Amino acid sequence: MADENSNLILKGLSKGDQIGGPTQLAKILCESIKSCKSFDKDDLTKRYLKWWQNDAFDTGPTYASVFSKIVMGTDPDEAVRQTHKEFDQNTAGCGPAHRCAPLAGFMNIPSTRLISIARQEALITHQHPDAGNGSALVVMICRLLLEGLSFQETLKNISNQPELKTILSRVKKAQLSPDGYILNVLFSAFYFIEEQTPMDKVFNFAGSPNYCPVIVGSIRACMKLKF
């Protein structure tokens, strides 16, 4: 069942991914979880590094900065801190939310651990808490949808969860925008999901950066919707 659900999310994610980087990183995440039988930050970091040193593309500037520093010998956590400082703390991107969604499909990992794991995974590259909380929000939405809730029921459930209700409230106040700020990416993705917007129109809105369609694809897959 874990393979079935994680593969379902991967398939949806890939349908929203016009470039390919998020799909490759999500596959690496799944490979690490399967190999370690759970989330292992050190193992995943090594796998992300190996990809960076070989076939990496479409990673985003934060990921690129962090792993460039690691290659030069910087401690991984220090590389994240340095990047956060060099970027004037502007590391609230959507990369973690893109790549981490399939985590929800590993039913052997309890729902009670998903938020913490998503935040830890985000910290491999993005220090800003919005990046981790946004990723955790996507993962929890996917898990609740897989458990049979509707999208609206899922949002209502999360609005009562102490660890996620604040980030969800902030997302609802964000903007419909094609930029990569995680709150705007999630606002836009939720808007298109609720409006049942065809993917071609979502792609047109997103433009070449293609930020929100990846989230739309992951969530729609968990809703068992046809693309």
Name each model-derived stretch.
Residues 1-227:
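Structured, active/binding-site neighborhoods that engage oxygen-rich ligands
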